[in-house]
């Protein structure tokens, strides 16, 4: 078995060009996980994945009678809780260097084809703003660039996010079962949209369990729990945070980018999205939902 794994590693490793060497471990993990998982949750960073994961986790936290603030890992915790489905949460190659590295466009994602996949998307301008605060406030990077310049020009900004989304707009039709969930719809109709995700994966829970998961993951509740350092997952802050821009649960506002940019700057960013982003996601002209 070890020899087989070594051969697979060598085959994969030799296919990576110099620009991709930093991602070979992720690529190997993704090849294995995507083909063996019960389901995939795919997103660009800062699009709402942790929110969905927290709701899914809370379903099983209630079922197993665990502390309500525990956030289960759908891979690592399956040893302790075999009933957990194997759900693979991935940012694809955008996970490398916190989204500042462009996805390799020439690589198909054939290993996703047979696995039911939910893609969570968010208005890319809001995503870019959230990514900026992730990199500057939470991780301490990018102190030499202001918000607008990062969103407009920076790696991990709007161009990168739209490129990621367009790549997956081309790939999704090859996946036998897939579902696109917009952050904005999940925000305005959480019970309905989360219920769609639960149904899509064939997870059986009573309506009151789904309702409880949605209530637990309300923005205000998660933010207060994060401020108090009561959430078990490492991605949340450990408490004592006064600046909300340092929090994982930061604002959760639809169209929040308007609070940071001038009317002219917003128009320029929106014009780019209108012209370049694939319309399959439903963003573009007519931003009444933002």
For the regions a language model picked out, list residue spans one by one.
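Generic hydrophobic-segment detector
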Residues: 33, 38, 192, 203, ...
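Surface-exposed alpha-helical segments enriched in charged/polar residues
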Residues: 166-170, 199, 215
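PAPS/PAP-binding and catalytic site of the sulfotransferase fold
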Residues: 50-62, 180-205, 213, 221-222
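PAPS-dependent sulfotransferase catalytic core
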Residues: 214-270
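PAPS-dependent sulfotransferase catalytic domain
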Residues: 1-181, 247-290
């Amino acid at each position: 078995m070890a020899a087989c794994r070594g051969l697979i590693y060598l085959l994969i490793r030799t296919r990576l060009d110099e620009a991709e060497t930093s991602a070979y471990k992720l690529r190997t993990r993704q090849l294995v996980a995507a083909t063996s998982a019960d389901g995939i949750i795919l997103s660009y960073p800062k699009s709402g994945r942790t929110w969905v994961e927290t709701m899914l986790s809370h379903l099983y936290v209630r079922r197993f009678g665990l502390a309500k603030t525990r956030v289960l890992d759908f891979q690592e915790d399956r040893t302790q809780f075999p009933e957990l489905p194997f759900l693979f949460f991935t940012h694809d190659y955008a996970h490398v260097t916190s989204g500042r590295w462009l996805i390799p466009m020439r690589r198909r994602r054939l290993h996703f084809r047979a696995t039911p996949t939910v893609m969570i998307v968010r208005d890319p301008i809001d995503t870019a703003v959230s990514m900026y605060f992730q990199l500057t406030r939470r991780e301490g990077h990018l102190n030499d660039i202001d918000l607008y310049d990062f969103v407009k020009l920076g790696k991990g900004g709007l161009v990168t996010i739209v490129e990621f989304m367009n790549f997956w707009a081309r790939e999704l039709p090859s996946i036998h079962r897939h579902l696109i969930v917009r952050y904005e719809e999940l925000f305005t109709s959480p019970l309905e949209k989360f219920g769609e995700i639960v149904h899509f994966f064939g997870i059986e829970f009573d309506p009151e369990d789904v309702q409880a998961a949605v209530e637990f993951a309300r923005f205000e509740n998660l933010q207060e729990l994060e401020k108090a350092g009561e959430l078990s997952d490492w991605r949340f802050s450990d408490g004592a945070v006064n600046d909300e821009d340092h929090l994982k649960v930061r604002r959760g506002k639809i169209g929040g980018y308007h609070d940071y940019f001038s009317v002219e700057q917003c128009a320029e960013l929106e014009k780019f999205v209108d012209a370049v982003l694939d319309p399959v996601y439903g963003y573009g002209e007519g931003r009444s939902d933002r």
